[in-house]
Amino acid sequence: MILDEGPIMKGQIYHVEIIASNFQKSAEFYEELLTRLGYRTIFYDKEEAGWGMKGHNFWVSQCKEKFALNGYHRKRVGVNHIAFHADSRKTVDQFYTEYLQPKRIPVLYGGPKENPWYSKGYYAVYFEDPDRVKLELAYVPVFRGFERDSC
């Protein structure tokens, strides 16, 4: 049963967990990234860390050695990518020029761009974490399927 207890939306994703090949490297990466995006550290241990903001959390854990042999690839069965909200196109552009480029974080598809086939005004930059998990920072002024609703 889903309870409606305030401003958290029914069915909203509560948390995501990434299993990393090198916890320390990934934890450092996500600590900087998520702090920049407004998350705060809620847990940090030698093989697991979590960051959160009201209503949802993001976790990173160390992969067990027996599962690490094949590594991650977004075209295999499983998660393809994770997208974070941006409040404007300017935020996406600043994130790209002030964060991704100076840190030499691998950027995909040549940098920020419009993706109108997703929805009107969709503007995003795609990049990779240390295990090549595809991440996205997206400004989405109109959500597909909700064009007539206020979003």
Indicate residue ranges for each PLM-predicted region.
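Glycine-centered tight beta-turn/hairpin loop motif at sheet-sheet or coil-to-beta transitions
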Residues: 55, 130-132
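Vicinal oxygen chelate
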Residues: 20-25, 83-130
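Short beta-strand/turn micro-motifs at beta-sheet edges
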Residues: 2-5, 66-72
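Long, contiguous binding/interaction regions
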Residues: 6-7, 37-46, 62, 87-90, ...
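Helix-adjacent hinge/juxtasegments
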Residues: 68-91
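Short glycine-enriched loop/turn motifs at secondary-structure junctions
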Residues: 10-12, 75-79, 119
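N-terminal beta-strand motif that seeds the catalytic metal site of vicinal oxygen chelate
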Residues: 2-27, 82, 141-151
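Core segments of cupin and vicinal oxygen chelate
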Residues: 17-64
